[in-house]
């Protein structure tokens, strides 16, 4: 396994995992009702997909999901869909912790599928809720990741994972998303990437996260969703 900078032209395939919409962003339930939260999740996904799809070194984007509405959105913007075969029913005890385990398994399978079909491609697992992401940030992170092996961009809280990279065909993606994922990824051998990429690091799980994203500036779909909901500055909620 080489850790030297690779000389071949960079090519990356981005995987974006989205759980079933009823289980998504439950920590925003004090700010938005279920329908509004669903609309916001889809809007943030749309903005995230638009940004990464425009990065020159990205040759493919796949959304990993069991949710048909998410799959429809993904296909409508030109992304591939890899179906997570194990959706979780509302109220199921696996709704929280089990969901992450299922999506990690689906991400790993999707990464293997991509590498079987696209020889030599770098694989990235990216959060779906990055409404402030900029293409330049993501391009810089990709370049930094290509110095070899498996690497991670830790989120703005310092505990979660915004993006996980595998830039060596011999190194599995080995996703370990879920609460405290940054520590698990680092302990499993991923190296931290230290660039100043605030939009890439600001994933949205709480009202405070949404405030932070809006301070950076959000993408057009997210902006339109927030304006329609008259929640352009929901700083009063602060769910944890």
From Swiss-Prot:
This is Phosphoenolpyruvate guanylyltransferase. Coiled coil: none annotated. SUPFAM superfamilies: Nucleotide-diphospho-sugar transferases. Keywords: GTP-binding, Nucleotide-binding, Nucleotidyltransferase, Transferase. The gene is fbiD. Pathway: Cofactor biosynthesis; coenzyme F420 biosynthesis. Its EC number is 2.7.7.105. HAMAP family: CofC. It comes from Rhodococcus opacus (strain B4).
